[in-house]
Amino acid sequence: MALRLLKLGATSASARVVAAGAQRVRGIHSSGQCKLPYGMWHFLLGDKASKRLTERSRVITVDGNICTGKGKLAKEIAEKLGFKHFPEAGIHYPDSTTGDGKPLAADYNGNCSLEKFYDDPRSNDGNSYRLQSWLYSSRLLQYSDALEHLLTTGQGVVLERSIFSDFVFLDAMYNQGFIRKQCVDHYNEVKSVTICDYLPPHLVIYIDVPVPEVQRRIQKKGDPHEMKITSAYLQDIENAYKKTFLPEMSEKCEVLQYSAREAQDSKKVVEDIEYLKFDKGPWLKQDNRTLYHLRLLVQDKFEVLNYTSIPIFLPEVTIGAHQTDRVLHQFRELPGRKYSPGYNTEVGDKWIWLK
């Protein structure tokens, strides 16, 4: 149900930009709904990816354990390279990119809580797996937004984690006994039918910080919930990164690894990036036709999230029909959520009959 609401709230990244631009224009009325989504006629008339993609049109992800400085490095890399920075997708990522950008209640965001996971990871109400399932969907949505931006503008993107590294948390949760084997099977089923449609990043940057140092940083940060994270859980995350994620990604893309000290020198990291040849991975096999189909997919957020809801009964992520109907109607009553963006009078939309 929550994923259904995520689909309802998700809109094309380019459509969001168009709508925002239309709201800023003064004078002659212009509609945020006028521009048609990219389609076959655009392609046939010459709007092709090869015209805007350059050697700097790259997808870069920055990965690492909790509190390793991923956000700082990703932001600095993006600024130095002239790329667009995508901060790590959290529970409220769909909220931040739709409506007024304000976080909605838990009922509309997977009914999960990161704070509760840290406080009670073995909670018998299924919060741990609901959280992981929802975060995968949020990262999937963000990755589609990043690819859409790349294919639409040609500008490179830098993300903090991605759908390709999300599983490290699932592995750690299962190893620590936080979730059941059935949850792992459900996750892998969803992942297998969604991730196959997406190209991996051109480059993965991994910040390697030992678990004791991670714990020291967590304590220094002072978040009362994060301070309850065990060293065993952090070690399992690190193991999943080093034993599975990095070996797999090294076959698909470039990989750079840095220590905590080395990662602080973003200038040196950028120099290393510029020396890379980017001579491996599926991006090299793409042409205008395949990138056309990829762009069609990533601009359609309903299709992006379609297979995150699969017909498998799992108590952790399943709710009854009556509750589904109630939450859906409550969601539709929220300001700006009843109709498509630009058609809701309660949030100030005007000239609706001309759109």
Curated annotation (Swiss-Prot):
The gene is NDUFA10. It comes from the Eukaryota. Its cofactor is FAD. Keywords: Electron transport, FAD, Flavoprotein, Mitochondrion, Phosphoprotein, Respiratory chain, Transit peptide, Transport. The lineage of its organism: Eukaryota, Metazoa, Chordata, Craniata, Vertebrata. Phosphorylation at Ser-250 by PINK1 is required for the binding and/or reduction of the complex I substrate ubiquinone. Belongs to the complex I NDUFA10 subunit family. The modification N6-succinyllysine is found at K285. GO terms for biological process: mitochondrial electron transport, NADH to ubiquinone. This is NADH dehydrogenase [ubiquinone] 1 alpha subcomplex subunit 10, mitochondrial. Residues 1-35 form a transit peptide.
